[in-house]
């Protein structure tokens, strides 16, 4: 479903609406079972919700749509039982979750590899070649949202310009694994910088230095006790721990 300007935003709004309802459904089911297990919840999210959010990511995956990530954050904050305005930096760090942009971008790069091997008689290959010839190297405002330009920009950003120049790599599986790790490392560094640059997080960073899921999320099985610790660590309780 595209708009008259060939935008995916209308379709994404529909997908994200369904995905958010699925998150609520998962939460209700787990409440009925009287459990809110960390591993189970996010396995269900990754298996049932994430595929809905990343539908057709091969095409739009290199564009960071906030509406997609908002559902991911909605699920994370509902699990932690914190307010919607809780800083996203704390949410990602506490759960050790990475933005879905990493997965969507990899889908686009994976599709780019597939396009390189298609014969020119195939319509997807013809569309790609036309887009590439018209836009790559002609980075005016009108061309910056081109799909091929986005692919090239991704390779350049993460230090793999040679892959674009060579129109591929020898071992695609190994490269995608390497690219994913590079994206993860860059995000970890960005997360750390945000944590250290803000006075608002001075208390949180005194006991949070590694980007990984906190052990108490699985060790504390009584939800009400876990929720108290979550709110205390994030400074969203009655005690003003950030001053």
Enumerate the predicted regions with their spans.
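Non-catalytic, peripheral interaction segments enriched in hydrophobic/basic residues
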Residues: 1-131
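Residue-level preference for nonpolar/small residues embedded in alpha-helices
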Residues: 84, 142-147, 221
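Long, internal protein-protein interaction and assembly surfaces
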Residues: 96, 137-141, 147-151
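Nuclease-adjacent, charged terminal/linker segments that flank catalytic cores
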Residues: 113-117, 122, 126-133, 147-157, ...
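Helix/loop segments that flank and initiate small ligand/metal-binding modules
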Residues: 153-243
């Amino acid at each position: 479903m595209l708009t008259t300007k060939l935008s995916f935003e209308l379709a994404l709004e529909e997908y994200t609406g369904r995905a958010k309802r699925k998150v609520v459904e998962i939460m209700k089911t787990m409440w009925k079972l009287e459990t809110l297990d960390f591993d189970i919840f996010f396995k269900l999210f990754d298996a049932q919700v994430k595929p809905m959010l990343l539908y057709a990511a091969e095409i739009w995956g290199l564009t960071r749509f906030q509406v997609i990530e908002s559902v991911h954050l909605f699920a994370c904050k509902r699990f932690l039982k914190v307010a919607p305005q809780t800083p996203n930096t704390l949410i990602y760090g506490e759960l050790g979750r990475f933005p879905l942009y990493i997965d969507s971008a990899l889908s686009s790069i994976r599709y780019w590899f597939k396009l390189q091997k298609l014969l020119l008689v195939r319509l997807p290959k013809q569309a790609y070649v036309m887009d590439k010839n018209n836009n790559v190297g002609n980075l005016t405002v009108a061309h910056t949202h081109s799909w091929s330009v986005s692919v090239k920009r991704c390779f350049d950003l993460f230090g793999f310009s040679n892959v674009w120049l060579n129109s591929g790599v020898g071992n695609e599986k190994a490269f995608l694994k390497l690219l994913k790790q590079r994206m993860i490392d860059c995000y970890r560094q960005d997360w750390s910088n945000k944590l250290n640059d803000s006075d608002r997080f001075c208390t949180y960073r005194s006991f949070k230095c590694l980007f990984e899921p906190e052990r108490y999320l699985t060790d504390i099985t009584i939800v009400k006790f876990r929720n108290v610790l979550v709110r205390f660590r994030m400074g969203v309780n009655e005690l003003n721990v950030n001053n």
